[in-house]
Amino acid sequence: MMTDLESRVSRKLMLRIIPFVMLLYFVSFLDRVNVGFAALTMNKAIGLSPTAFGLGGGLFFIGYFLFEVPSNLILHKVGARRWIARVMVSWGIVSLASAFVVGPNSFYALHFLLGVAEAGFFPGIILYLSLWFPTRQRAVAAAWFMAAAPISGAIMKLPPIAGLADWQMLYILEALPAVILGFFVLKYLTDTPSKAQWLAPEERDWLIAKLKTEADARQSHAGHTAGALSALRDPRVLALALIYFGTSADLYTLGL
């Protein structure tokens, strides 16, 4: 059973962090799948064949795959809060530029760049959650965060505004929140529990001690710091990767 102090800290973490990161992931997933909705009118407008459209959609994941690990290596250097903000602003700008594609080549380039820009966001948030939530609450926190993805599929048809087609307005109106939220991340999120002024001193001290105890226990159990190549050979990592592959395939199939 949770102690009263543990219960208070858990409640504050859930209320302060989870709704906000859910909003970030909602916007993230919206920007990924909006191409499927935009295609209803965009393909004809810019002369995009179904094959070219499929290739452009695939290029997003190539950029995402190639730059996800480098992005997370940088994230560890500069901190999750700053890097998440950078990711959101850059993908918002690229998504905004997608409203002005004129043909297959610009469509290909921008969707590849969108994957590059967005690489590292999801694992960056997972890392951020691990800096705040003890092991006991971490799975619940991650589950709430991931619940934002399927919700983002509900999009209404947007009317043309100021001479722009509806698919252009879709890109613009879904890109702007990413840019705005990217800057807001810097103000709202706190780097580490030691800097959390929204926790009472005793709550902050308990959380820091709890996370340190768990980290020391993991380090003692592991006996060494495993590198990326060692992780890729771990059957548990491969099994989790396969599970995530299946989950992502389902979500993107429904979204697109």
What is each model feature region?
Residues 16-50, 156, 254-256:
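Extracytoplasmic
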Residues 57-73, 124:
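Central cavity-lining transmembrane alpha-helices of secondary-active solute carriers
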Residues 47, 79, 100-106, 117, ...:
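Helix-breaking motifs and short loop linkers at transmembrane-helix boundaries and internal kinks
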Residues 35-36, 229-256:
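Extracytoplasmic gate region of multi-pass secondary transporters
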Residues 110-147:
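Cytoplasmic helix-loop-helix junction between adjacent transmembrane helices
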Residues 103-111, 238-240:
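Short hydrophobic/alpha-helical segments at membrane-entry points of transmembrane helices
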Residues 66-105:
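Conserved MFS/SLC helix-loop-helix module at the cytosolic interface between two early adjacent transmembrane helices
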Residues 145-196:
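Helix-loop-helix hairpin linking two adjacent transmembrane segments in secondary transporters
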